[in-house]
C-alpha cells in the first residue's frame, strides 16, 4: 500500500514539475489533450481583432461625474444562475451604473452559453439608463472547445472602451485576454501600442480588466493558467509606468487586494451558486476610484 501511495505522490510531483517547466502554450496543449481543444492566445487575439476591425471601440455616456461600475467574475454557469441574476438585477437597478464587467469563466463547461444569454435576458432592462455588459474570456471559456461559442455570443476578448462624464471627463477601460496565462506576442504588442496611445490622451483614469491575476497567495487553482515570472514582471512594469490606476481580475475564487507602486491589483470573489461567500465589486469612479465588495445571499 505504501508503495502505491509513493508512486501516486511521485506521479503528481512529476506532472507538477512538467507544468511548471512548460510555457503557457505548452501547458494549454497538455490540458487540451485531456479536456478538449483550446486555441492559443495569438490565435484568439486574431479572432478578436477581426471583430474589432469592423466594430469601432465604443464611448459610453455616464449619467454623473462620480459613476459606478459593477464587476463580477467566475460565475461558472451551468443550469443554475441565482447569483448571476442577482448581480444583473443590482446593476440594472442602479441609475449611476452605465456599465458592468464580467472577468471570465462565464460558463463552466460546454453548451451552457444559451443558459447565460437566456438568464441575462430574463431580468428586465431599465429604460432610464444605458445597459452595457463588457466581458472577457476565462480559462473555462476557451477550454472544452468553447472558444467558438464565446465568439458567437460575445465576439471579442481584447478591446477597450471609454466612459465619458457629463462634464467631458474620460476614463479608459482596457479589457484583455489572459485566459491561458499569457498575453502572447501579438496581444502584448497591442497592449504596448494601446498604452502608448493612451499616454498621449487626457484620460482621467485608466482601468484594466482580465481573468488571470498576477499575484497568487493560495494554491486553490494550482498552476493552471498562471503567468510566468518574466511576463508578470513585464506587465506590472508596463501597467505601472503607463498610469493604469486599477486592475480587476478573477480566477482564484478568493478576494485579494495588492498594491504595486501606484497600481492597485484586485482579485474579485467568485460568484458561483455553490460558493459559501459569493460576492461582487462595485467601484465608484470620480476624481479618485473607491470600491467596495458586496456579499450576495447564498442560494436557498
What positions do the PLM features span?
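Active-site glycine-centered loops adjacent to acidic/histidine catalytic or metal-binding residues
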Residues: 74, 104-105, 138-139, 211, ...
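Extended active-site neighborhood of metal-dependent phosphoesterases/phosphodiesterases
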Residues: 34-54, 112-204, 225, 231-240, ...
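Hydrophobic beta-strand anchors of alpha/beta hydrolase catalytic cores
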Residues: 69, 100, 173, 206-207
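Short acidic, glycine-rich surface-loop motifs adjacent to enzyme active sites
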Residues: 198-219
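N-terminal active-site segment of His-dependent metallophosphoesterases
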Residues: 25-114
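Bacterial N-terminal signal peptides that target proteins for export
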Residues: 2-11
